[in-house]
Amino acid sequence: MRTVQVPRTKTGGRPTQQEAADRLQRLLDVARRQFLSAGYRETSMESLAREAGVAKKTLYSRFGSKAGLFATILDALRRKWVEELRGLVVESDRPETVLETVALHLLEVGTRPDMIELYRLLLLDAHRVPGLIRGYYDQQGGLSGMEPLADYLRAAVDAGELALDDVPVATEQFVYLVLGGIRTRMLLGAARRPNAAARARLARQAVRIFLAGCAR
């Protein structure tokens, strides 16, 4: 296993805010790679510390436990996703345009090989490790990074553009309509990642079905 040294500051003093952020990101990259490669239960703090080139006590001091480190990785992914999604949602656009943009992004990100491996890890280990992701989902109110979409749908309902009785449920249904089928087949090894043209077709069809049930 190769070791990824986390660089120290040149001055020997406290790291700058940017240096600290860079070091944390490198550490999280190492941890994410090991979790995806070996699985949650088989990954140890010892192996993570060794590959990252840091002391094990540093990991425990920063994250508290392996579960805390994994939760930090999930939260970092969620924050990045939410930031990307917020940049895509333009409330002045028509619902069809906004939803197709979101659907395409869901398919582009959600069918990436590394994301499929993450889903597989969660499916395999979540029931073996109680609380592995339950607290994360509870903290996010069940939306798990889809808050910008929920906010948009709620605004569209208020504007009289869509008719939805339960926005959080509709948000979840939209995600599964877009991503659920192909992701399940990929997880089972029954399908390869669709190419860009196929992803665009899936996005358009999912949006048409969704709007057929809620457009005014």
What name fits each language-model region?
Residues 1-38, 42-54, 61-62, 67-68, ...:
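Basic, helix-initiating cap at the start of DNA-binding domains
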Residues 1-14, 101, 105, 147, ...:
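C-terminal peripheral helix-coil segments that are non-catalytic and often amphipathic
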Residues 40, 63, 123-129, 139-142:
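Short helix-capping/turn signature of helix-turn-helix
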Residues 110-137, 182-188:
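Amphipathic alpha-helical segments used for helix-helix packing
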